[in-house]
Amino acid sequence: LTAAKRTAQLAPSASPLEVLKCALLEIDTGTRCLHMTATNMEVTLRQDVPLLAYEGGDTTFAIDAKLLSAMLANLPGNTVECCKGDKDTLALSSDHAYYQVAVTSGKGFPRMNIPIPEGMVKLSGVPSMVRRAAFATDPNNSNMPLLRCVNLRLTSDGLRAVGSDGVCIVSAKGDKQCTGDQTFLIPAANLEKLAQLCEEKDTFSVGMADRQLVFVKEGFQFAARLMHGSYVDTDSLIAGTQNTFTVLSDSEELRRTLQTATAACMDNRTILHFDGNRLTLRCTGEVGSSNAALTVIPLTGQPFGDYCFAVDRLERCLRALRGTVTLGIAQTGMLTLSTEDAFYMQTQLRITAPKAKPARKKAAKAA
């Protein structure tokens, strides 16, 4: 059931190719395994499910991935009996429950090869790493495809994941034991697919082959196509950013305050007003204005002034970060947020006066 659920998550619900909505099932009598494969042409997942018993020869067929997952979820018991009929039908039964559905031969299913890289490194903590980096990318940018990507970098200090949409940048720490000297550009959407299919404790062997980044653990192989290009030099940008002042706060409290302050926000803009140990977030719209404040701890410099930032980007950042956060304003007015595991920067917006409502004309009196 777990394997079927993963397959259903990866197989696209809507696709011009009906076969991509399917899971390819291959029974291998040599290894006594059921190989379950799904692909959306960008990423491919293959899982090996051990068979308790099997009669017959090697068999290959395709079945709607979400239908398979739904049927297995509703069958009682811990084991299920599968019987492939002669006329492209599959019967699933367990205890007193029974399903019979149509399947196809699987001949039209795209054979996406998952290569085994020669040099591989160990990696764990994938979901948290993806959460801290993928939010800053721009998944719908067709003009600059690299902004749809997360830049994974193996360094001597461990793995780093960088994301940017051109307005904000985040550099997040990954597994400290995953060291090396390589860089990979992978679409954030594909990396998020992997994060949905695994747990924080899962340890993968990771390597590159045939322009794909491959993640392998027992009974599980995931391959994602890589992008090519030169990514922005984020190390230089971060190193060149000097804060004029910094304050200490809690990411969750800051997120709640932002949520409260944006009740009247109509233009995706919020003003951060710093005044010593008090930070006030203000929004003004056609329907009115709102503000919310919280107490912060000044760390360096003199926290004072008004700075305007995009609400949606700041909100996504605060949802991704955890724990204590150091919030700063750089000389250029750029906002910085730093935690133990990530460093975030966002370009400020110009503060504009709210638009005044046009005065209503008095109705002319009837003669």
Identify the role of each PLM range:
Residues L1-A367:
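Structural preference for solvent-exposed beta-strand-turn elements
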